[in-house]
Amino acid sequence: MRVKVLSRNPDDYVRETKLDLQRVPRNYDPALHPFEVAREYVRALNATKLERVFAKPFLSSLDGHRDGVNCMAKHPKSLSTVLSGACDGEVRIWNLTKRQCIRALQAHEGFVRGMCARFCGTSFFTVGDDKTVKQWKMESPGYGEEEEPIHTILGKTVYTGIDHHWKDAVFATCGQQVDIWDEQRTSPMCSLTWGFDSISSVKFNPIETYLLGSCASDRNIVLYDMRQSTPLKKVILNMRTNTLCWNPMEAFIFTAANEDYNLYTFDMRFLTSPVMVHMDHVSAVLDVDYSPTGKEFVSASFDKSVRIFPVDKGHSREVYHTKRMQHVITVKWTSDSRYILCGSDEMNIRLWKANASEKLGVLAPREKAAMNYNQKLKEKFQHHPQIKRIARHRHLPKSIYCQIKEQRIMREARRRKELNRRKHSKPGSVPVVSEKKKHIVAVVQ
């Protein structure tokens, strides 16, 4: 006689220790879960609400400067070290872990106009209103030693910006022209110029390291190649560009911060129209910096706010502001992609989280899995009206809120006027110009 018996493997359901979780048998057949999507929607809604509840982005304020913070630089090798230069010529080096100043030195008379660290992290360069370029050791001087620069170069004109090559002992300064310097020489290797207006910013490309871009006060963005003696090309915009930043992951992409409240992301091969126009600020954009991932960038504006933009979106995903923060002059995204630093003209440097609701510290494996699951749910249901409304909601200062409202009315009036003009004109006489091409005056090769 044959007898059928149930045979179970204890390893499938018995815990090894009392601390282990009970194993729950699950059947993933969709026919048994008709309300799966509805449950996921509720979970996504709750996750979105909790994200807004836990959004506490502000971490710390680094105070110590006695004048407005004019520029900042990141240490290329150390995540916890950042440098800042003020309007009174003082340079401070900060430890972000301890959130305190570890070194202060009087670098220049007048403004510190620009600063950058050497690619190996052993020294840094500063330029100021006193027409000098100075190289300083990154380490503090020993006991009894005086704080002296390694090299000092006295120029003929005021330098307004500086940036270091990503691989070689070469740096570039800008003022009346773009000068390329060797660290061992006191005169520039070559000088590049196109036009007669002063240049406010110069930046090396981190991937194609021989390329650099500059912003001039005559509304030009000029691109150069160090290997040839003449500039490559330039694009002229409606208003002046304050600074630009290259995408660290895509060699030909850069973003320009403009006086017309917008940021423009360009592909340097096709300058006739920007890849994307980023608009949300209500005053001039003064600085921009990319995330190390190249997916997002942060901008600082004269409207006393900091905004985070996805590269492929026209509007910001996040806006940071405080009651005491004044005009934000400079901004940096840390090299671990988790924090943002901004320097403003009321003498403070502020440290923010890049993701406002991110939990800091070590996460348990279950906690990490739950966060990843919630993130996927939010992405899945991000276009549902209720979830979209909660995720986009932000509290803004009254001044910014009123200016946004005013800008919206003005934009709508311009659009209406253009439609009326086209309607009452001869067909084809009033061409349709896209938002991307409206702001480009000309491209000169």
From Swiss-Prot:
Pathway: Protein modification; protein ubiquitination. Residues 353-441 are annotated as: Required for nucleolar location. The keyword rRNA processing applies. CDD domains: WD40. Signal peptide: none annotated. GO terms for molecular function: ubiquitin-like ligase-substrate adaptor activity. GO terms for cellular component: Cul4-RING E3 ubiquitin ligase complex; nucleolus; small-subunit processome. InterPro entries: Sof1, WD40/YVTN_repeat-like_dom_sf, WD40_repeat_CS, WD40_repeat_dom_sf, WD40_rpt, WD_repeat_DCAF13/WDSOF1. One of its GO terms (biological process) is maturation of SSU-rRNA from tricistronic rRNA transcript (SSU-rRNA, 5.8S rRNA, LSU-rRNA). WD repeats lie at residues 64-104, 107-146, 149-191, 194-234, 236-276, 280-321, 323-362. Its main location: nucleus. It is found in: Nucleus, Nucleolus. Pfam families: Sof1 (PF04158), WD40 (PF00400). Keywords: Nucleus, Repeat, Ribonucleoprotein, Ribosome biogenesis, rRNA processing, Ubl conjugation pathway, WD repeat. Part of the small subunit (SSU) processome, composed of more than 70 proteins and the RNA chaperone small nucleolar RNA (snoRNA) U3. Component of the DCX(DCAF13) E3 ubiquitin ligase complex, at least composed of CUL4 (CUL4A or CUL4B), DDB1, DCAF13 and RBX1. Belongs to the WD repeat DCAF13/WDSOF1 family. Part of the small subunit (SSU) processome, first precursor of the small eukaryotic ribosomal subunit. During the assembly of the SSU processome in the nucleolus, many ribosome biogenesis factors, an RNA chaperone and ribosomal proteins associate with the nascent pre-rRNA and work in concert to generate RNA folding, modifications, rearrangements and cleavage as well as targeted degradation of pre-ribosomal RNA by the RNA exosome. Substrate-recognition component of a DCX (DDB1-CUL4-X-box) E3 ubiquitin-protein ligase complex. This is DDB1- and CUL4-associated factor 13. It comes from Gallus gallus (Chicken).
